[in-house]
Amino acid sequence: MQDTYQREINYLRISVTDRCNLRCVYCMPEEGVRSLPHGEILRLEEIETVVRAAALTGVKKIRLTGGEPLVRKGLEELVRRVSGIPGIDDIALTTNGLLLPSRAKALKEAGVKRVNVSLDTLRADRYAEITRGGNLAGAWEGIQSALDAGLHPVKLNTVIIRGFNEDEVVAMAMLTINRPLHVRFIELMPIGSSSSWAAGRYVPAAEVMDAISAKLGPLVPARQPAGGGPAKYYRLKDAAGTVGFITSMSEHFCHRCNRLRLTASGGLRPCLYDGREIDLKAPLREGAGTREIAALIMEAIALKPDRHHMLEGWRDRRQMSQIGG
């Protein structure tokens, strides 16, 4: 289905939980965030109904997010259900990777095709700092398990933060030379309580590109790996993988936006940076069927703004983990 601005909306990001086994500084504060009671989180069968309804409106791609999606019990069963829905041809997962070693094979068998793993640094001390206690070796084990399970492509999401990891961009890009990894540099976005923390830490993608090219040679435009999305991709000479840039702040890509977001509590959000949501949980629990939910999804599509307004400030009191990454 097309929205008001003739964009084809075919992608639904689903936050299956607001809980996480890490506490990354740009995603949630160290303390004070109230987790949703289990009764307020959409049940697996409710998520399945939403996906069936979304497929009726033209959604073809699903991404499961969190929080950390792998802390949600029954995730593999949800994937099996969703993968069998007519019209859904792609299921992906965004994760910190720590729980992947024991789950990657089962997720692949259930129907997950590919994964994005959050990895902001190659230094163990910095990883522990940015995640507030995470284990870098565990993340790497998860990345390797994804490769071994055949979850291709494996994309690494790296948020660039001035004063923290901008000195690692060359090393991160070098990961793509000998391995089939796709490193995506993401501009820091001011969201939730991290807005004040992010002040002064923003690094434009152009600066990262210049730093990589100066050390490793030209970045040649490359075909996009499977999955689409907003990143622009490049390849270093003879590299096995690609380097991507997501320019949410410096060069927005709203004219190409094809997505909706479903929060863990059942709110359908037309735009990450727009506070409007359509509640799907209440109708679901009042007995609404697939076609009724599809009608609400079409309402959400009609609400999609022409572009985000990040520079005007965050319009929601919730954290990124509560909305869905």
UniProtKB/Swiss-Prot annotation:
GO molecular function: 4 iron, 4 sulfur cluster binding; cyclic pyranopterin monophosphate synthase activity; GTP 3',8'-cyclase activity; GTP binding; metal ion binding; S-adenosyl-L-methionine binding
Biological function: Catalyzes the cyclization of GTP to (8S)-3',8-cyclo-7,8-dihydroguanosine 5'-triphosphate.
Reported cofactor(s): [4Fe-4S] cluster
Domain Radical SAM core residues, every copy: 4-219
Cross-referenced InterPro entries: Aldolase_TIM, Elp3/MiaA/NifB-like_rSAM, MoaA, MoaA_NifB_PqqE_Fe-S-bd_CS, MoaA_twitch, MoCo_biosynth_MoaA/MoaC, rSAM
EC number(s) on file: 4.1.99.22
Catalysis performed (reactions): GTP + AH2 + S-adenosyl-L-methionine = (8S)-3',8-cyclo-7,8-dihydroguanosine 5'-triphosphate + 5'-deoxyadenosine + L-methionine + A + H(+)
Lineage: Bacteria, Bacillati, Bacillota, Clostridia, Eubacteriales
Keywords per UniProt: 4Fe-4S, GTP-binding, Iron, Iron-sulfur, Lyase, Metal-binding, Molybdenum cofactor biosynthesis, Nucleotide-binding, S-adenosyl-L-methionine
Family statement: Belongs to the radical SAM superfamily. MoaA family.
Signal peptide, first to last residue: none
Gene this protein is translated from: moaA
Binding positions (S-adenosyl-L-methionine): Y26, G67, S118, M189
Residues holding [4Fe-4S] cluster 2: C254, C257, C271
Domain of life where this protein originates: Bacteria
Sites where the protein binds [4Fe-4S] cluster 1: C20, C24, C27
Cofactor note: Binds 2 [4Fe-4S] clusters. Binds 1 [4Fe-4S] cluster coordinated with 3 cysteines and an exchangeable S-adenosyl-L-methionine and 1 [4Fe-4S] cluster coordinated with 3 cysteines and the GTP-derived substrate.
PROSITE patterns: MOAA_NIFB_PQQE (PS01305), RADICAL_SAM (PS51918)
Entries under Pfam families matching the protein: Fer4_12 (PF13353), Mob_synth_C (PF06463), Radical_SAM (PF04055)
Protein name (Swiss-Prot/TrEMBL): GTP 3',8-cyclase
GO biological process: Mo-molybdopterin cofactor biosynthetic process
Residues binding GTP: R13, R63, T94, K155, R259, L260, R261
Subunit structure of this chain's protein: Monomer and homodimer.
Pathway: Cofactor biosynthesis; molybdopterin biosynthesis
Enzyme class label: lyase
